[in-house]
């Protein structure tokens, strides 16, 4: 029997051509292209094309003018439900019954609808929908999203969201991507795989940490002393959000490109964030010189999204939008392998027992 590996950590379950997180060198490449060369240079819609097709064009198409059919008051619930409903509405067929070209087209249609649904749900029912004629004036997928959500977005905010989505578009075998591949491996339709991935993303251990960085920033703005805050937090056994990563043994490359972009866009909280980062890295190194605890993507993602006036409760939804690119690429790659993902579990429960040994048997036995 194979060795038991809790959480499957370190287990190689797939071979992929999509992304290469270089944990030692602190770099992240999408099909060989470093994200340093993508963020701020190639828009998210074309990065979707790179990840899915290996080419920038045609990229992600505009979303179809389809109103979101669910209004629960929770963006994740709305998007996850609405995605699943695309299958009967559009007549999506199981991946098992279609070829790769059809799967790719289905993924493009469904993935961009996820962005549309996030924007529509975030706008809410209290405001009228933005006319399609206004949305069609946009020059990029990200700008279309922002117009659908807000009506007239600040161009700098569009650049900030584009940078974040590109940097967070794909990151190898994480929980939501694994979920998408498992569902795809069953031969289910693409909407089912995307919907399942959205559910996995909703867990705070995967998609919920960036919003927690803002609390630290706000406290330092109040006190004006980043070093004192860091020392007090660590002395109290608190975790500094935005530092350390399970993959990288060097600085998270996504943090690096988002820091650069935040400075280029003159984000108001850049200096406070930079002071916190410097104080945290110095104190963490002093206390744990044997460990590499560098800045991760969550830290500067929070600064970028805050700059773009994205409310904290939407941070996970924005992460979801970004990761639709990686999910789409992995779903298509899994479709091409054609192999069902079926790991094993080692039984460690009780041995053979008589029902009479189970508590409550006397109450239910006839």
Enumerate the predicted regions with their spans:
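Hydrophobic alpha-helical bundle cores within soluble ligand-binding/oligomerization subdomains
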Residues: 1-366
């Amino acid at each position: 029997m194979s060795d038991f590996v809790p959480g499957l950590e370190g287990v190689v379950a797939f071979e992929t051509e999509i992304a290469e997180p270089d944990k030692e060198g602190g770099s992240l490449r999408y099909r060989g292209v470093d994200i340093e060369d993508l963020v701020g240079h190639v828009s998210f819609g074309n990065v979707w094309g790179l990840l899915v097709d290996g080419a920038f064009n045609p990229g992600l198409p505009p979303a179809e003018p389809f109103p979101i059919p669910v209004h629960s008051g929770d963006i994740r619930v709305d998007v996850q439900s609405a995605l699943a409903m695309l299958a009967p509405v559009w007549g999506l067929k199981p991946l098992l019954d279609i070829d790769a070209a059809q799967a790719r087209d289905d993924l493009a249609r469904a993935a961009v609808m996820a962005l549309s649904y996030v924007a529509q749900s975030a706008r809410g029912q209290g405001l009228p929908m933005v006319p399609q004629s206004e949305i069609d004036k946009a020059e990029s997928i990200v700008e279309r999203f922002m117009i659908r959500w807000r009506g007239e977005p600040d161009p700098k905010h569009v650049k900030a969201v584009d940078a974040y989505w590109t940097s967070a578009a794909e990151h190898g075998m994480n929980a939501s991507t694994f979920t998408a591949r498992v569902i795809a491996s069953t031969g289910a339709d693409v909407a089912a795989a995307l919907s399942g991935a959205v559910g996995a993303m909703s867990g705070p251990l995967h998609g919920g940490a960036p919003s927690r960085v803002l609390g630290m920033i706000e406290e330092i703005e109040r006190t004006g002393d980043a070093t004192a805050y860091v020392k007090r937090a660590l002395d109290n056994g608190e975790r500094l959000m935005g530092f350390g990563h399970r993959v990288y043994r060097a600085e998270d490359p996504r943090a690096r490109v988002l820091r650069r972009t935040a400075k280029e866009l003159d984000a108001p909280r850049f200096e406070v964030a930079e002071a916190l980062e410097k104080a945290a890295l110095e104190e963490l190194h002093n206390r744990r010189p044997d460990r590499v605890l560098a800045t991760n993507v969550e830290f500067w993602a929070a600064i970028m999204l805050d700059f773009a006036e994205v409310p904290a409760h939407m941070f996970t939804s924005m992460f979801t939008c970004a990761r639709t690119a990686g999910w789409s690429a992995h779903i298509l790659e899994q479709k091409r392998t054609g192999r069902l993902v079926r790991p094993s579990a080692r039984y460690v429960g009780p041995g053979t027992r008589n029902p009479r040994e189970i508590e409550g048997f006397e109450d239910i036995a006839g």
